[in-house]
């Protein structure tokens, strides 16, 4: 074809300079250093550190496991939607982060489903605003869960309906009753992932 290429062509690391600093920058990312702190530590310009952050995070986004095996735990996490940087807010501003105007789970919160197996393979899916539904679970979980997996969740009705329709073994742990562990069934791995 007459074109030149190398192993990095077509990847997020293509055409980046200072290859000797990449591992040190990855360590800065893992240590949750700010862009300016990383730039100061590596002696590069802050714009370079900012561009690198986006390139490295693109790599992390594509590095996901293909399938969960064995015992898989699933739980949902609700976060307030951030409109930081938006020129036109769709709601009144929340000063200093704040809290939702409505109590409980509402359309102000984004639902994130986290599924994790006992080997540590973790997948997360943004399902939308408001309460979790079985339709949202059907959209994200079937491609990444084996048919012979045991799905362990809390008592949410959407998981029960999804597992029944998908033909997946399901066991619910009744957290409201104070039962956190039933033999090998618990959702502590995925809840620990939430707390990070």
Residue positions per predicted region:
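Residue-level recognition of single "structural anchor" positions
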Residues: 1-196
């Amino acid at each position: 074809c007459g074109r030149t290429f190398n192993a990095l062509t077509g990847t997020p690391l293509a055409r980046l300079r200072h290859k000797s600093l990449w591992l040190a920058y990855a360590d800065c990312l893992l240590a949750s250093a700010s862009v300016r702190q990383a730039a100061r530590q590596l002696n590069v310009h802050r714009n370079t550190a900012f561009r690198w952050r986006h390139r490295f995070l693109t790599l992390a986004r594509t590095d996901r496991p293909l399938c969960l095996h064995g015992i898989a735990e699933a739980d949902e996490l609700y976060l307030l939607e951030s409109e930081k940087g938006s020129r036109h807010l769709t709601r009144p501003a929340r000063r200093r982060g704040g809290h939702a105007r409505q109590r409980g789970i509402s359309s102000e919160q984004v639902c994130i489903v986290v599924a994790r197996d006992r080997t540590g393979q973790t997948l997360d899916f943004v399902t939308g605003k408001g309460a979790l539904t079985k339709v949202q679970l059907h959209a994200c979980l079937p491609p990444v869960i084996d048919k012979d997996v045991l799905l362990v969740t809390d008592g949410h009705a959407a998981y029960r309906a999804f597992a029944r329709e998908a033909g997946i073994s399901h066991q619910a742990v009744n957290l409201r009753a104070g039962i956190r562990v039933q033999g090998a069934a618990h959702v502590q791995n995925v809840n620990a992932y939430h707390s990070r």
